[in-house]
Amino acid sequence: MGQRYNSNFLRIAFAFVSMLLVYYIAAQIVAAATIFEVLLGLNYQHGILASVAVIALYITMGGSHADIMTDGIQGIMMVLIALLIGVIFFMGVGFEGTGPSMINNALVIQDPSLGWDNYLKEGDILFGSFWLISLIFVAHIPFAMNPHIGKLAFALKDPKQIRTFLLIAIPVGSILGFTVLGGLHARALFGDVIRPDQAIPVLFTQLFPPFIAGLLGVGVLSAIMSTSDGLFISIAVIFSNDLYKKTFAPVIHKSKSKEQIEQIALNISRVAIVLVGVVACWLAWNPPQFLAVLLWMGVGGILAGATGPLLIGSLWRRATKTGAIASFLVGVISFAVGIVYCFVLKEVPFKNPFAVAGSCIIAAAITMVIVSLMTKPLPKQHVDDMFGESA
């Protein structure tokens, strides 16, 4: 971001905002601990410690190379699990009868508003109106701007591979959406007596023999690992590269050699991984009812700040430095105010991080366009270099 707009402020500010990824990591740790709790019978807090230890050791020893090389294998396991969830859902496994209609009937008996013909649930903070549902979609538009996702593009050896990447990623991403059906299936079978985030592991343990359920649990852990390792690496890079190498080293370590700076950066990244693990543990110790709430309290702030400078700036050549800074500030500050209002003030019943994020993303996008049109554009040569069109 700093290079796109020749702005040290944007590079440093976005680096600090990206530390909100610790909430994302906390959500992944909660998910892993839940798997250990349901499948292995571990105490939830012990599961948290085990999850952090395994992930941190894995990343510290392997780094980005291990992250990228193993994500492909873990991704295959995730796709297989998602397909299995889809199959047992459409077969209506666990019910007397065949087909997804069995699941729908069970849901309607529990609560008529859960039926598939109901799109809105009056009074619900997430699905109470068409506008609230729309904000969920808006909040996800810039999701690829998350640092741990965007960095994957740098693993491509040739920009021409982006086409192949998209041809694979789009259908695979669609298949992974089948996992949502596991939540419906579990609710239909077990009612609301289980914690929502336990739905899929409980579904596996009840429908399959222990050995098979264990293997399926490994698939779910693969999904958690493939996300968590990237998150840890992203935050480590923020500390070691964005803050130290690009910002502070040129000022405080002018006399040090390139090799010395690289070694210091490596040590900083390893320390950062440990610190992030400790903070994530603390956040995960007493999680909210839904993981999505914990996750979006962090992700929403990052996306609100990235929408203008990164998303619009990567598509629109006319984006300006002033517009990017204004958009970043509007997005981040409005998100912070919204989160404090909705989640810190106890008397406020409206606790919807998607609505807060979606609204702030819209505000940031509008700010980016208006301010950019009113301010001086960046030099043409610089823009050509950024878009790969220089002579």
Question: How would you label these PLM feature ranges?
Answer:
Residues 2-391:
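Membrane-embedded helix-loop-helix hairpins and adjacent transmembrane boundary segments
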